[in-house]
C-alpha cells in the first residue's frame, strides 16, 4: 500500500527528488526533461523563478509548478500559467502536466489536477492536450473539462484539443497558492 499523495507548490528543498524524477522522465523520452537532465538543480531554480515572472521563455506568463509527492518521491508535475496571452489562448493553455513514467495509470495526474481545482483555481482556465494522448484526455474528462475546440499545432505536428476547466465547487484559494 502506498502512503498518501501530497500535492503542493514546488520548493527548492525538493531538489533531490526532482533529480530522480527528471532522470526517469528524461530516460523515457519526455522532451522537457531531456533538456532538464543537463542541470536539474538549475532547472528547478528556474521553475521557481517562473512563479515570480522571472526568466520565462518568450511569450510565457508567470507559471507556478506543483508536485504530487509520495513521501520523498515526485509522482507528477503540473505547471499553472497565470494570465492570458496569445500563447495560452492559441496552443499552450494554462495547465501542463506529466506523470512519472513508472507511476502512470495510477490516477496521480487526476489527483493533482483535482487538488488544483479545489485548492488553487479561482476562475476557469484553458487546458489542452495532444488528441492522441488518450490518458490525458481521460484525466481532463474526469476533471470535468468542457471541450471547446481542436487546432493543429504545426510546431509539434499534431492536433491539440482545448478544454475549459473550472474550479471545483467550494472555496478556492489565491491563484498563486
Enumerate the language-model features and the residues they cover.
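GNAT-family acyltransferases
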Residues: 1-94, 98, 119, 154-177
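Conserved active-site alpha-helix within GNAT-family acetyltransferase domains
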Residues: 132-149
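Conserved GNAT acetyl-CoA-binding A-motif
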Residues: 120-131
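Conserved acetyl-CoA-binding loop-helix of GNAT-fold acetyltransferases
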Residues: 96-99, 105-118, 137-142
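Alpha-helix N-capping/helix-start residues
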Residues: 12, 110, 131-134
Amino acid at each position: 500500500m502506498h502512503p498518501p499523495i501530497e500535492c503542493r507548490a514546488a520548493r527548492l528543498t525538493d531538489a533531490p527528488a526532482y533529480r530522480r524524477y527528471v532522470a526517469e522522465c528524461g530516460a523515457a523520452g519526455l522532451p522537457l526533461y531531456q533538456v532538464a537532465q543537463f542541470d536539474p538543480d538549475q532547472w528547478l531554480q528556474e521553475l521557481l523563478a517562473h512563479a515570480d515572472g522571472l526568466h520565462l521563455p518568450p511569450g510565457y506568463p508567470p507559471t507556478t509548478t506543483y508536485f504530487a509527492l509520495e513521501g520523498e518521491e515526485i509522482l507528477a508535475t503540473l505547471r499553472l500559467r497565470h494570465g492570458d496571452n496569445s500563447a495560452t489562448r492559441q496552443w499552450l493553455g494554462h495547465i501542463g502536466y506529466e506523470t512519472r513514467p513508472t507511476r502512470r495509470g495510477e490516477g496521480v495526474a487526476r489527483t493533482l489536477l483535482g487538488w488544483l481545482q479545489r485548492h488553487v483555481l479561482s476562475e476557469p482556465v484553458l487546458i489542452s492536450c495532444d488528441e492522441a494522448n488518450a490518458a490525458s484526455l481521460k484525466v481532463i474528462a474526469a476533471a470535468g473539462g468542457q471541450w471547446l475546440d481542436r487546432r493543429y499545432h504545426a510546431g509539434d505536428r499534431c492536433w491539440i484539443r482545448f478544454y475549459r476547466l473550472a474550479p471545483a465547487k467550494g472555496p478556492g484559494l489565491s491563484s498563486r497558492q
